[in-house]
A protein has these predicted regions:
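A SIS-like phosphosugar-recognition module
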Residues: 1-157
Length: 157
């Protein structure tokens, strides 16, 4: 899950989701605060969290445990933060991150740097592009080929 806390951070969050899909072949769900507080926080109690699981993730010898409980397969919340957050959005981001952590969801908060909106979005987008290529390499995925896009283009041509 990738959330943005302002118009600038929301645009960067959209870019991060797209790059996670394209470069790392890794699914991502986009959200912009405050709307995410009405629907996406429900995922904190869902299938991909320890709070929503009935098995014991601490027992690696449990043959029948669902591997979704392994930390690398769980839900991860990334919140892109901006200095121009509305105070209510700031409180919602802080509360949502705390709720996620309380439920065993990994949380990463990345803050835009700079004063001008263009500078702030550039810092977040540059970080997003770098992180997604790095993640692809860490997962053993070549980030350059896009066979699914090529296939889709061929099917609609």
């Amino acid at each position: 899950m990738v959330w943005g806390s302002s118009a600038v951070a929301g645009a960067a969050a959209s870019r991060l989701c797209g790059q996670l899909n394209a470069n790392a072949k890794y699914p991502a769900v986009l959200g912009e605060v405050p709307e995410t507080g009405h629907d996406q926080v429900m995922a904190f109690d869902g299938f991909f969290t320890r709070a929503g699981s009935s098995s014991d993730p601490s027992d690696p010898d449990d043959f029948f445990r669902d591997r979704v409980d392994d930390p690398e397969h769980g839900l991860h919340l990334v919140v892109l933060r901006d200095v121009e957050e509305h105070p209510r959005v700031r409180r919602r981001c802080d509360a949502s991150a705390m709720m996620a952590r309380d439920r065993g969801v990994a949380v990463t908060e990345l803050r835009a740097e700079g004063t001008h909106p263009l500078e702030r979005i550039a810092t977040l987008i540059a970080l997003a592009d770098y992180v997604t290529v790095y993640l692809a390499i860490a997962l053993g995925v070549d980030p350059t080929p896009v066979p699914a896009i090529e296939e889709l283009k061929a099917r609609i041509a």
